[in-house]
A protein has these predicted regions:
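Short alpha-helix capping/helix-loop boundary micro-motifs
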Residues: 38-42, 83-88
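Primarily a LysM-type cell-wall glycan-binding module
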Residues: 2-30, 51-77, 97
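Terminal low-complexity, poorly structured segments
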Residues: 1-3, 36-39
Length: 102
């Protein structure tokens, strides 16, 4: 269960206490990229259950840059490749395509 502790004025960042499901599940609940949350909090590893961290909502739309691959986009947002493709009803990505992040 998520304990929302504080919502920043810009509504893009907020503070949560990591619930029993763990850090990755908490990121999924808030559509946040795990690697970005770790960096945002200045951590070297995933926070443990009970830790209080700043979360940031991920962008819901992403424009594919010419140098990006499906793998790199999915790693950035912490989603599976099949998830991203299925969510957007596509079978591949191409430069300047706009995709919605699940």
């Amino acid at each position: 269960m998520t304990n929302l502790l504080f919502l920043f004025d810009d509504c893009k960042k907020f503070i949560v206490r990591i619930g029993e499901d763990g850090f990755i599940e908490e990121c999924k609940k808030h559509s946040a990229a795990p690697c970005r949350i770790i960096a945002l909090n200045g951590l070297n590893e995933e926070p443990q259950v009970g830790a209080v961290i700043v979360m940031e909502r991920a962008q819901r739309l992403h424009v594919i840059k010419p140098y990006e691959s499906l793998q790199s986009v999915c790693e950035y947002y912490g989603v599976l490749e099949d998830e991203l493709l299925e969510y957007n009803a596509i079978s591949y990505i191409y430069p300047y395509q706009i995709v919605e992040i699940p």
